[in-house]
Amino acid sequence: RTREEQEFFDSFRIYVVGGTEKWQKKAAEVFPTMHFLGSEKNFDRSALAQADYVIINTNAVSHACTEKAKNAAPKSASIIMTSNNNLHLLQRKLLETIQ
């Protein structure tokens, strides 16, 4: 990732819900400024209150958790659904969505 892309990602509040714990750990290494809320329905709804983008990885997440995340996100936030665990593809999808 270029420095310009990194600064670009750093300028947004991006939250991630879903995916396996192993995937979230790996994603946190690649995207250290993103906020990871886990895959359980019991996350704090207020955590998403300031989100610019909410990524929902539909692998290893319940339908109830997905719906809670969608409903908790501000109306101004973009919801990005993915079922792909490839972090490079996730980065590309984010850049396409944001630009």
Which residues make up each language-model segment?
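Redox- and metal-dependent alpha/beta enzyme cores, enriched for Fe-S-associated oxidoreductases
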Residues: 2-43
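Ser/Thr/Gly-rich flexible loops in soluble cytosolic domains mediating phosphotransfer, phosphorylation
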Residues: 74-99
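An anionic, turn-rich surface loop/hairpin at beta-sheet edges
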Residues: 39-46, 70, 79-81
